[in-house]
Amino acid sequence: MTKIARVVVDVTGVDKPFDYSIPDHLADDLVVGSRVRVPLHRREVSGWVGSILDARHSDVELSRLLEVRKVTSVGPAPDVVELVDWAAHRWASRRRPLLVAASPDRRVPRRAAARYSSRSSGETHGPIAALIRTGGGVVQCGPASRHVEVLSAAISTGPTIVVAPTIARAGQLAAESRRLGFTTAMYPQEWTAAASGVDVVVGARSAVWASVPNLSCIVVIDEHDDSLQEERSPTWHARDVAVERARRSSVPCVLVSPVPTLSARHWAGDRVVATDDANQWPTIRIVDRTVDDRWASSLVTSPLIELLRDHGKRVVCVLNVKGRARALACNACRTVARCESCGAAVNQPDEQHVMCPRCSASRPVVCSSCGSQKMRAIRVGITRLREELEAAAGRPVQEIAPSTELLNPAASVFVGTEAVLYRVDRADVVVFLDIDAELLAPRFRASEQALDLLLHGARLVANGGELVIQTAVPHHEVLTGLAAGDLSTHVTAEIGRRERLLLPPFGALAEVSGKGAADVAAQLAESLLVQVAMGNDRALVRAESWDALSEALAAVDRPKERVRIAVDPPRA
């Protein structure tokens, strides 16, 4: 029976596959995933072979089919192409951007010889090895963990993919893997080596698409990190792709983090292992800003002044200005006003009501602690923050911006947004001047994102340093849990909030924006599978499951106007 190739063309905006006949001279070289050149509308374009079918399955008569012109390169393995099909449905996406992530960035005429070390086989022992043998799960580690035990246990099962949140982190893990004696390929730079066969393939989020012969295990490092999710549409998350790929391949998946997300915990169930260093965090000090008379107008508290005046300490001060919550507090007792449903900071649209920007719950302006009906906005006075710090410290303070390249050698106190944690290489103390801006932000993952920020600070000071957290909500379960070394109360509370609001991982969420958002929202509102809340320029779509959400989005007729669909939006 004559075979045809169903090709996904490498053309922006085109997702419909086209059928082409396979000439005899290409029959042996052309496989699912191959990069090919095909004719399309009187020109020749590149594409990927999505599937190979009998000619009788084509809607076009064989005599009318055009031929594949040539095979240009090795492409993603067939199992990766199938994974791309799943991901395109899951994130309401075209396949092209996903296939690009899974393909080499240059022509690869053929795979090379495999390079496996003798160290990649042999049974290892311990709780992590036992977890891997039973299908994988979550490994909770310490902030400064080098993940040697995880790497050794995973690679001992056979070829392994290791996904890290950043290229720099991936490079460190690759160096560690080579030090342990394993053959290692960095993805995507060493795509050919990865596809030919090595002990371990390491890379940032795109490594989850690596073609790996005889895949035996997938490890995701720092699964909590937002960098593992693509910001542009499709907003796929490497953690979720890794879990699905492991399921399809019947191999273990290991999600590693000092602060595992609810999504990871929900997937793993009771398959959670804590390493010996899991509780080895630096000293954590919670500073209650409301006990200071200047609490509403200044971030320079008395404990902070004491730290700054110790000139032997290198201090980093963090204030995330972008996207911060404008908090309200009781004018009488200073209690921060929070939503009774989801815990976010509320705002005051009029004299009689406060409203939650996260879940839209509304209630009268009454303090939940003392009954007062007067609120005040907490202003942080950031315009002269550096000058205030410098005056308090009696030594130079350098402001760090994302564009800052060189540090002032005379400075030992630094202040900036989150970028300061990446520009300064070491510190004795990291001070979060106003963690409430993250902790109470109108995003359902606010507490997880605040934990991520605190973790970056913990890694900067390591075990011998100190983490100082200034807050107006000192009894928040995230802060009390961190101080006590036990986040179980926070996890329980967060599970309850998300279950009530049908938020991931107990439901599915998408954000529709752009000029055509109203049209798409109107179509979705007619579906029994989803709930739609339309705002000024965007719509939030909720469903009981990812399958229900995907089915509803797939049934929408896309309007001509621009529409962006972000499934599982990172900042909703």
Where do the protein language model's features map onto the residues?
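Short glycine-rich anion-binding loops that position phosphate/pyrophosphate groups of nucleotides
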Residues: 206-208, 224-225, 321-324, 419-421, ...
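C-terminal helicase module of SF1/SF2 nucleic-acid helicases/translocases
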Residues: 32-37, 302-306, 310-313, 388, ...
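Conserved RecA-like helicase motor-core motifs
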Residues: 180-190, 340-341, 349, 394-403
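Cys/His-rich short segments
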Residues: 309-391
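Amphipathic alpha-helical transducer elements in NTP-driven molecular machines
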Residues: 27-30, 46, 77-81, 170, ...
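Accessory, non-ATPase domains that flank or precede helicase/AAA+ motor cores in DNA-metabolism machines
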Residues: 1-290, 306-310, 315, 333, ...
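Short loop/edge segments at beta-strand edges and connector loops
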Residues: 188-189, 203-204, 319, 399-402, ...
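Conserved phosphate/pyrophosphate-binding and hydrolysis machinery centered on Walker-type P-loop NTPases
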Residues: 74-77, 144, 163, 167, ...
